[in-house]
């Protein structure tokens, strides 16, 4: 957020000042509720909301927002989730994982987080022998558990893997076996130097594909920026233009590279269309998705 805001202001008419306000709580639910229901509609509020909101809206229900009605201005990067396994498992690809006799033990923070959802879905839909242990306070704790042998796998954002455990990737201590999102990244290789498969492409039928698309929505929406519903269209368009200009700004890209930030931009129209498609997932399939996770 800080990096984008620092450069975004240069492209907004009048070059206004930005004040960052953090609003933690409920896994992003508090901030989403504020932006959707309380924040002024005059264009003076810009939000970077949780990428989990589309999935939460369907899987949790009873939320105080509708992601399809937000005014998106763009996405700075995807949150492509990559499933990694520790080198001692001997697993170097998804095919190896399918043949593994010992379960791959994944560390996770909570049952509503992607580091729990992704490996759970891989076990249920792909038939992999996995066990997911939830309760770790965060990524650092799971990484420590990997080093200590408590767990043998973790699903996490590719950007997080690179910034926090890039040395493990280079040394081969962790091996990528799958990626989750709506688009495949050819840069993510398995232990054999091959592109890791996109989970969405492994769906056996249309229903499975729709369910996997729902679970991949957080990766697709990624690090997105939006404005409340009801903001005048002219102001939204101005912000969309400013955001697009920022994403190609040489100073911004150099700053992002210095901070080891992956930039994979998408325009406001793409985000709006994606959010609407996700929210339109048929209720019977949402029910099946909840059942896969063991949610009542």
Kindly give the residue locations of the regions a language model identified:
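Ligand-binding clamshell of periplasmic/extracellular solute-binding protein-like
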Residues: 4, 26-29, 43-56, 75-78, ...
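Hinge/capping helix and adjacent helix->loop/strand transition within the periplasmic-binding protein
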Residues: 7-15, 34-45, 54-148, 152, ...
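An extracytoplasmic/periplasmic, membrane-proximal ligand-sensing/linker region
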Residues: 170-172, 176-177, 194, 202-204, ...
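Generic structural signal for residues in well-ordered beta-strands
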Residues: 18-20, 130-132, 263
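Short loop/turn segments at beta->alpha junctions
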Residues: 27, 137-138, 157, 267
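A ligand-binding cleft/hinge motif common to bilobed small-molecule-binding domains
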Residues: 51-63, 116, 120-125, 153-202
């Amino acid at each position: 957020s800080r990096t984008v805001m620092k450069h975004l202001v240069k492209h907004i008419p009048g070059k206004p000042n930005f004040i960052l306000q953090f609003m933690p709580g409920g896994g992003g639910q508090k901030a989403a509720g504020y932006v959707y229901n309380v924040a002024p509609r005059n264009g003076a509020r810009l939000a970077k909301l949780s990428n989990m909101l589309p999935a939460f809206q369907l899987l949790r229900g009873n939320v105080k927002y509708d992601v399809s009605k937000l005014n998106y201005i763009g996405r700075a990067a995807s949150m492509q989730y990559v499933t990694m396994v520790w080198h001692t498992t001997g697993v170097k690809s998804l095919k190896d994982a399918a043949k593994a006799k010992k379960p791959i033990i994944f560390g996770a923070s909570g049952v509503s987080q992607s580091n729990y959802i992704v490996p759970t879905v891989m076990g249920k839909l792909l038939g992999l022998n996995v066990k997911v242990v939830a309760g770790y306070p965060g990524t650092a704790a799971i990484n420590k558990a990997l080093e200590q042998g408590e767990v043998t796998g973790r699903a996490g954002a590719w950007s997080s893997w690179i910034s926090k455990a890039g040395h493990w990737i280079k040394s081969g201590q962790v091996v990528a076996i799958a990626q989750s999102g709506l688009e495949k990244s050819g840069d993510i290789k398995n232990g054999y130097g091959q592109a890791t498969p996109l989970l969405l492409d492994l769906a056996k039928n249309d229903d499975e594909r729709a369910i996997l698309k729902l679970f991949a929505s957080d990766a697709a929406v990624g690090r997105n920026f939006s404005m409340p519903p009801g903001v005048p269209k002219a102001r939204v368009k101005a912000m969309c233009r400013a955001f697009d200009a920022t994403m190609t700004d040489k100073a911004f890209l150099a700053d992002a590279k210095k901070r080891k930030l992956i930039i994979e931009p998408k325009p406001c129209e793409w985000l709006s269309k994606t959010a609407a498609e996700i929210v339109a997932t048929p209720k019977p399939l949402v029910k099946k998705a909840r059942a896969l996770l063991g949610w009542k």
